[in-house]
Amino acid sequence: GWWMHRRSRGEATGDAGRIAAYALATTGFAALFLDVVAATTLHGFVSAPAGLGTGLLVSVAGLALADRWRARPLALGVVLSSAVCAPLITQLPDALLVGFLVLLQVAAAPVQVRRGWPSLALAAGVPVVLAALVATAWGSAFHDPVLVVAVSLAVLVGVVIAAITAGARPEADRTAIGLLVAAPTPAFLAGPLLLEAPAAGLLGAGTTALLLAIWAVARFVPAFRGWLSHRFTTAVGAMAAIAAGQTTVTAVDSTSWATALLCEALVLGVGAFLLRSTGVLLGASCYAAFGFLLALAGEAPLTALLWHGDAPGVPGLLCGLLLVAAAVLLPAAAVRVGEVPTSPLLWSATGLVLLHGAASATMAACLLVADTRDGFLTAHILITLSWVVAAIALLLRGVRHKHLRVAGLVLIAASLAKLLLFDLATLDGVARVVAFLCAGLILLAAGSRYARLLKA
């Protein structure tokens, strides 16, 4: 192959000669890999680590030759041959296999960055991810601490090489994003399958910290602000948000998932407000949506508002307050970012979250003071009156703003429906009188005030 490549430089059939040289060289390296497999697996002349070390040397030599010749097919053939032969040597999807493929990816990185070969990045990166996933699934039946280290190393190397590829080769941006999305997935699987909750949380936190560090450097460090593309930086932020959510679900008890996700939604909401970032706002909205759905099934269920006996306690109070804070903060952040939603459905959903959070917090607080039927009835009186007061405030503010006026009218209708359909059937005695009397007085005072504002 070397001889034919040298001859092809000065001949008219140079392209054909180069192709033949690439084919011969690739065949030669493939034969060397098969020799290593035979010496290790069939005849047992060398151990598996020694065989992998020899295979790595052959791969490095092949990549060096491909770089010198600028022969992408040769580089692909060497890397893929090495990746295919490695499982034949280890015979198990273990830490040794993952470690070898990580070293192979590191060896291929300088060549693919220097020559701008995105296909080589995929050929070196995809086997690492697949081997790490298979090894994690296999390792769930066997306790192997070294496997966790190998998977963590694979994630670290994969993410870093993806970032280097995106920065050094902007034209390979999509390939780098694909590698970035794939690289952390073994850590997402390894935490729940291989580790206990605290250790799994540390693994997930490390993955999140790595992704956040790359995002922060690309976003705030002036020297790197233009090095990574906006699309890649957005992808890093999205993967960091996914990693943080997966870490939360893995490390936190299921009874506190909603509270934890809502706390993270508030943190992201503050970040979106300060940074005026649409991507951060989208992440905060996703966290808040999942937190609300989990709250309905856990800390702040609807059953706690319908029947006495299912007291939410302190978790329900905290979760309700977090729902209220999220329902207020996220629209404020959207206004500051300049991405105010125009869909009435989104505003209606936000209003429902706000009402449910306030009602759940009120119910939990009253039942913490007196976990009796009187406490339950008092909570419903306060919930109804708070809805009426909020509706009046919206109507008064909506004299010149149609959307606020419509929201106030809808909330008034909901308050009266609750008063007549639920409170009338649930409350009795003094509680019923107090609820109707207070609601009527508030509506009377607000109606007269609203009429004066309209005349003015």
Language-model features: locations:
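Extended, compositionally biased regions that are outside compact catalytic cores
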Residues: 1-385, 394-405, 417-456
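Pro/Ser/Thr/Gly-rich intrinsically disordered low-complexity regions
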Residues: 412-416
